[in-house]
Curated annotation (Swiss-Prot):
It is an enzyme of class 2 (transferase). Gene3D superfamilies: 1.10.287.280, 5' to 3' exonuclease, C-terminal subdomain, DNA-directed RNA polymerase, N-terminal domain. SUPFAM superfamilies: DNA/RNA polymerases. It comes from Neurospora crassa. This is Probable DNA-directed RNA polymerase. Its EC number is 2.7.7.6. Belongs to the phage and mitochondrial RNA polymerase family. DNA-dependent RNA polymerase catalyzes the transcription of DNA into RNA using the four ribonucleoside triphosphates as substrates. The keyword Nucleotidyltransferase applies. The active site is at residues 546, 617, 798. It comes from the Eukaryota. InterPro entries: DNA-dir_Rpol_C_phage-type, DNA-dir_Rpol_phage-type, DNA/RNA_pol_sf, RNA_POL_N_sf.
Length: 896
């Protein structure tokens, strides 16, 4: 019963908290310059943790019983492994010497924990003294070790979130232990309460006193404040940092009154990883269909879905909580949304055994065409030196090591889960949403929303014999994975036909290593090989189709911008046409702007910039998701430039690290790159003034609502009411002491009575567009369900997947759902009318309308004879010509 609470607090982390059990052998790190990797012992399948889950999966019990056991035992892996080390148990193939060293280390740590608790240095966590020290160690290491590997940007590690997570888990473990003890005592008290024997009366009195103490401790524990929980997490994290050689909690001063705190590996981390089943997970794929979510007539959740333990104990809500937009946590649901969640979670998957076998062969060449590692299979050999490298924040080894280790943790987790699931007949992914109604699949590395490795290892359980449509879709997807998605479909099909003999020669490493996505290309090649050998071949591979500049697709449809719609593939096109590429089409305008800017003496060097698609794509793509000029500047600098020198008289200078963008001997000032960022940012709005008009309208609406002290509310096309209200936060300091060392915490507290104007404006457009993404999926799922069509379906926000034979149907459903959202010119007017209603509901007669029923202004009493007047922006008038919606169904590249 205790263990299930481990899962509760992964929710605050991004969806990339990947996980499973894996154990490395103790061979030396292999030279990564060598093109071949030894993979036989990469993941030991006889480790204690691995076998714990594997034995449950392979047992003769019912699937429901096995699923329940998996959920319970999964969260105890770290404790199991540490207990095994303490008892000097180990799995075959593990490092005997290292295991003995670790046993001694852990015995010492237990003494440190006991001393820490006995001296009252528990940072005000009532009840923690009742927990086993080995459990406390397992909780801390189970969070800190993966954390130290996971985050590739070491200078932006969310350490406060880590401390909060550890503190919360310790809190709830203490609560469980107290409930357990209270239950035992109550049972005994009930047994002896009526006895008059002196000995039993004495026992009764002692037990009731202890019971009162436990209940009082429990009350204090349940009322523990957020900052106290963070202090607890920091305390135990710092203690193990001071007393172990696994990791180090460091603090670095970066400016006056400003410092960063980060966690880095220490000397014995590799030994630990080589002798333990590393866990970093919320859940594994389910071997039974996830339980359904259910709501009542008031649109409140009455039955939790997903995992069995989630259904029983309500651990994780359907909607992930938002700290910044806290009011969203109380928003209601609706039937259409909940039905869509239940539909998506019922799609069964299996492991692509051919891919799993291929990538774990001894002879697997683990390098792509650019000599980049495809799968990261070992911790970076210089990880223990990271602390030394951190003395110089500019040292490129920092990024090299942290990026490597982050990918290592991710890839290892994916392959470990695949190995666990490879013999499972079928498995499922739980589905959750955020407050905008956007869908997220399972907090597990192996899911359809994961990276290329995860997607290459997943197959739909229900396969089909390929028909003509399916074979064509598979060939196009193969070409896409190779990197030909910017060509016409006709050209892609021709390329596959011309190279088919090479593609299906699976042992021909050269062709798939040339692909942009080599593992997905390999998965496609295996399907084509199967069909080529037998036309009755049953295909299971999910075919992914990606929307083109999806944010701009939505915005262009809102304002009926025919020119922009054409550039983002909303209009009629054929298989002989190339898909339009907005990013490339903006380049001539940007070049012209740079040419004009370079006529100024201080910006002469800008003419040395070669404007490539890669330079502008990310900035243009993220404008609709809230990117600012400064944000684009940060993107460009981080990817293409490095600091050259700091001269206080002339400012910050950079050199380009990509010779395709600029010569490496040309020095650019910060002003140069800021101007370049401004040109990129403004290019979209200068070319498409309707887009600028829409952005100005949305921003002005949000500004007025902030002045009126109102959140932004809107209704999705399927009827869900969404509210955005970002609070202001105030910072305050807290101090705690661990092992005579002082730790200062800078914490934030939300002022729920105030609204952050800056955050409201910056976040609204991306949040609004994301809610339309989610709406598109809800509408298409409900259409599929209502029509009774049996179709495998998965989605990654604006990317859609189905069986090859069903791609034409899915494309049609996606387009139809998009048309339903924007099919008439009243979309923005409906949005405006709802805003008016919200204002009128609060201000009543102080909200003033014109003769046409349009809200013009609000008057606010300021204590004088003349009230304040706040003008309301007029509704945005858009072109009523619906040519866009007439053509979407005939677009070959709406999703590509």
């Amino acid at each position: 019963m205790i263990k299930f609470y481990f899962t509760t607090f992964h929710m605050k982390f991004p969806a990339r908290l990947f996980s499973t059990s894996f154990t490395l052998n103790n061979t030396n790190i292999i030279n990564e310059k060598d093109v071949k990797y030894i993979t036989k012992n990469f993941l030991l399948e006889n480790s204690n943790g691995f076998n714990l889950i594997k034995n449950i999966i392979n047992s003769d019990e019912t699937s429901e019983v096995k699923q329940n056991k998996i959920e319970v035992e999964l969260n105890n892996i770290w404790h199991t492994e540490i207990t095994d080390i303490l008892q000097k148990k180990r799995s075959l193939g593990l490092d005997a010497i290292g295991s003995s060293i670790l046993a001694k280390d852990f015995h010492n740590l237990i003494g440190d924990i006991e001393n820490f608790i006995n001296k009252g240095r528990t940072n005000k966590l009532p009840g923690v003294e009742y927990l086993k020290p080995s459990l406390i160690i397992s909780i801390v290491l189970g969070k800190v070790i993966p954390f130290s590997l996971r985050h590739s940007d070491i200078f932006n590690q969310p350490t406060h979130s880590l401390f909060a997570e550890i503190g919360k888990i310790l809190k709830y473990q203490s609560i469980f232990e107290l409930h357990h003890r209270i239950g035992l005592i109550q049972n005994r008290v009930e047994e002896i309460k009526n006895y008059t024997e002196k000995k039993l009366v004495s026992e009764f009195n002692k037990l009731t006193k202890v019971l009162d103490e436990y209940k009082n401790t429990l009350k204090n524990l349940e009322e523990l404040s957020g900052e106290s929980i963070i202090k607890v997490g920091l305390g135990f994290t710092a203690l193990l940092s001071e007393t172990s050689e696994f990791y180090s909690l460091e603090e670095q001063i970066i400016a006056k009154n400003k410092s960063i705190r980060y966690i880095i590996p220490k000397n014995k981390l590799k030994t630990l990883i080589n002798n333990i089943t590393l866990m970093d997970t919320i859940e594994l794929p389910m071997i039974i269909p996830p339980l359904e979510w259910k709501i009542d007539d008031n649109e409140k959740i009455i039955e939790y879905g997903g995992t069995i333990l989630n259904n029983k104990h309500r651990i994780r809500p359907l909607r992930t909580k938002s700290v910044e937009n806290s009011d969203a946590n109380d928003m209601t649901y609706n039937k259409e949304l909940v039905d869509a969640v239940n539909f998506k979670s019922k799609i069964p998957y299996t492991i692509n055994l051919k891919i799993l076998d291929f990538i774990t062969r001894d002879e697997f060449i683990n390098r792509d065409k650019k000599d980049n590692v495809i799968i990261y299979k070992h911790i970076h050999p210089d990880s223990a030196l990271l602390g030394e490298y951190m003395k110089d924040r500019k040292n490129p080894k920092i990024s090299e090591i942290t990026t490597h280790n982050s990918k290592f943790l991710y890839h290892s987790s994916i392959i470990s889960i695949a190995k666990l699931m490879k013999d499972v007949k079928e498995f499922y992914m739980t589905v959750f949403i955020d407050w905008r109604g956007r869908f997220y699949t399972s907090s597990c590395a192996l899911n359809i929303q994961g990276g290329e490795l995860a997607r290459s290892l997943l197959l739909f359980k229900e396969g089909q014999k390929l028909n003509d449509i399916g074979l064509k879709a598979l060939k196009i997807y193969t070409a896409n994975a190779f990197g030909l998605d910017k060509r016409s479909k006709e050209e892609r099909l021709d390329w596959v036909e011309q190279n088919l003999h090479k593609i299906i020669d699976i042992d021909n490493y050269e062709i798939w290593r040339e692909a942009d996505e080599p593992l997905l290309f390999l998965a496609c090649a295996l399907e084509l090989k199967g069909y080529n050998e037998d036309p009755n071949f049953i295909s299971h591979l999910p075919i992914l189709m990606d929307a083109t500049c999806n944010g701009l697709q939505h915005l262009s449809a809102m304002v009926n911008d025919f020119v922009l719609a054409e550039k983002v593939n909303l209009l009629k096109s054929t298989e002989n046409d190339n898909p339009r590429d907005l990013y490339s089409e903006v380049i001539p305008h940007i070049k012209q702007e740079i040419l004009e800017a370079s006529k100024s003496y201080e910006h002469t060097n800008l003419e040395r910039i070669n404007v490539e698609r890669c330079l502008v794509k990310r900035g243009l793509m993220t404008i609709t998701y809230g990117a600012t000029e400064r944000g684009i500047y940060d993107q460009i600098v981080s990817k293409f430039f490095q600091k050259d020198e700091w001269n206080k008289t002339v400012g910050l200078h950079f050199v380009c690290i990509d010779s395709d963008i600029a010569p490496k001997d040309v020095v650019f000032t910060q002003k140069n790159i800021l101007l370049l960022s401004k040109i990129i940012y403004n290019s979209l709005f200068k070319i498409h003034p309707n887009l600028n008009t829409l952005m100005v309208y949305f921003n002005s609406i949000v500004k007025v609502l902030c002045e009126l002290d109102l959140p932004v509310n809107w209704v999705t096309p399927y009827g869900l009411v969404i509210q955005q209200k970002y609070n202001k936060f105030t910072k305050y300091n807290e101090t705690t002491y661990v092992a005579s060392k002082r730790y200062k915490l800078v914490l934030r507290k939300a002022d729920t009575t105030s609204i952050s104007k800056q955050k409201q404006i910056q976040a609204f457009i991306p949040n609004f567009v994301h809610s339309m993404d989610g709406s598109n999926i809800v509408l298409l799922i409900n259409t599929i369900r209502d029509e009774g069509r049996k179709i495998n379906f998965a989605s990654i926000h604006d990317c859609f997947a189905t069986h090859a034979n069903d791609t034409a149907w899915l494309s049609w459903y996606v387009k139809q759902s998009f048309i339903r959202i924007y099919s008439d010119s009243s979309f923005l007017r409906r949005f405006h009318n709802y805003i008016q209603l919200r204002i009128q509901a609060k201000y009543g007669e102080d909200a003033h309308f014109d003769k046409d029923g349009v809200l013009t202004h609000v008057t606010i009493d300021n204590g004088t004879d003349i009230p304040d007047r706040i003008d309301i922006p007029k509704p945005l008038v858009v072109n009523k010509d619906n040519k866009i919606y007439k053509e979407i169904l005939h677009s070959e590249y709406f999703i590509n």
